[in-house]
Amino acid sequence: MDYILKAENLTKIYGHHKALDNFSIHIPQGSIYGLVGKNGAGKTTLLRIICGLQEATSGDYSLYGISSRKHEILNARKEMGAVIETPAIYLDMSATGNLKEQYRVLGLRSFDTILKMVGLEDEAMVTGTVAFKVSLLAQSLSPGLLTIMLLYSII
C-alpha cells in the first residue's frame, strides 16, 4: 500500500515537556484524516514537523515514501501545503518578502515565475474589488487578505 504519510515513533521535547511521545501514524494515499485532540496533545507540533518548520527530537517520518532524513523530502513537501494555527509570518517583512521566505524554506527556486503564474508580477494584487500593494507590511493586512497571501504561498 502507498502512504502519503508514515510517521514512526515521533517524539518532540521542549525543555521538560514532551509535545509528542513516540507518535506513529500511517495515512494511505487518497484517504482523508482529521487530527483531533485536546490542547497540548501535539497536533500542531506534528504538522510543524511534517512541514519542516521544526525537527523531531527522535523518530522519523516519510512523505510519499521519501524519508525525512533525505534531502529529497524538500520535493515531497512541495506537493503539500498547510496553514497551521497562527500563520507563521514575519511582521516586519512585506507580503512579498514573506512569500519569498516561504519559497526559500520549501527549496523552490523561481519565485518570480510563481508570481507571474498567479498574476502578481506587478506591484499590485487584485482580489475581487479589493486591491492592495504587495509591498504592504504583512501586519497591516486584514485577516482575509493575510489568508489569501498564505494560500498563495502554498500554491
Where would I find each of the regions flagged by the language model?
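Short coil-to-beta microelement around the adenine-binding A-loop and adjacent beta1/P-loop entry
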Residues: H17-K18, L74
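The feature captures the beta-strand-to-loop junction immediately N-terminal to the Walker
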Residues: Y33-K38
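Helix-to-loop junction immediately C-terminal to a conserved catalytic motif
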Residues: C51
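Conserved ABC transporter NBD signature motif
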Residues: G59-R69, N75-A76
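Q-loop/switch helix immediately C-terminal to the Walker
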Residues: T86, D92-G107
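Conserved ABC ATPase "signature" region
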Residues: K100, R109-A124
